[in-house]
Amino acid sequence: MRPRALYTGPVEEQRSIRHRMQFILTFSCPDQPGIVAAVTSVLAERGADITETHQFSNRESGTLFMRLAFHAPAPGNLAEINAILAPVAKRFGMQMRLHDAAVLPRIIIMVSRFDHALLNLLYQVRVGWLKADIVAIVSNHTDSAATAEQAGIPYYCWPVNKQNKTEQEDKLRALIKERKADLVVLARYMQVLSDSLSAELSGRVINIHHSFLPSFKGAKPYHQAYARGVKLIGATAHYVTADLDEGPIIEQETARVTHNLSVEDYIATGRGVESQVLARAVKMHVEHRVMINGHRTVVFA
């Protein structure tokens, strides 16, 4: 018996769907009437089919944030569509970005000894939930070398100390350029990036902190939480800035704990939360659902 097609409509329509390219448009600008109509009208005139829209108007700053996903007739390309949208962007003073949804974002993952968040990211990529290309794994330890080898991903072990930190960060800069990485993910990488590197990679580095920020910043947050007798522990995925654990928050989650649990129980519970929160944050970033709004983020989940 022949398998049934997922779509049973007219053959011509199926051909049309196959020959359309998907793009994602994100922009922010001073809010005023007519912006959405202007953008969607230009896309409609080009024959685009808008499949998803999200928008948020920040009343405090008077800024509009918007994300649109759309199909455009082939052979469409970024340069052509950017040129079509340029007059609208200029008219409304937009900060605009257009992305080809077929191009997988390239990610470098950095990890120290605890590999639970790394393993979950690799799994989510393998099963197709996280659509990205992991182009390298960097660590200051050798612990995850076998994991990288099994996954067929280049592994770089660069131990870090006060004397060689600048040299090792220069290696990272070179690797990002060589591998054409779009994003760096700190999956429990226990080294603090320098202020200069944090600024250079602004909006391109996501960290998972093992506490529900802004509570318990810095080292050993589970021990801090245990000492305070909290009833909830959590994890926070945020963009990295020069201020430690102060970057714009992308995603958070909590888990309930009780008085009869040990610090080790807190840590074990937290590992699952960290892995889930980081994976969700990375997914939202690579799908261009996160827009930085000062010290905050707009997340079109």
Report each predicted region and the residues it spans.
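Short, glycine-rich nucleotide/cofactor-binding loops
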Residues: 107-117
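Histidine-anchored nucleotide/phosphate-binding helix
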Residues: 116-126
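Short hydrophobic segments within beta-strands
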Residues: 28, 108-110, 138
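Adenosine-nucleotide cofactor-binding segment
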Residues: 149, 153-179
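Donor/substrate-binding cores of folate-linked one-carbon enzymes
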Residues: 141, 164, 168, 182-301
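A conserved regulatory-domain signal marking ACT and ACT-like small-molecule sensing domains
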Residues: 19-105
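Short internal beta-strands
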Residues: 132-143
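N-terminal amphipathic/basic-hydrophobic helices that include classical n-h-c signal peptides
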Residues: 1-20
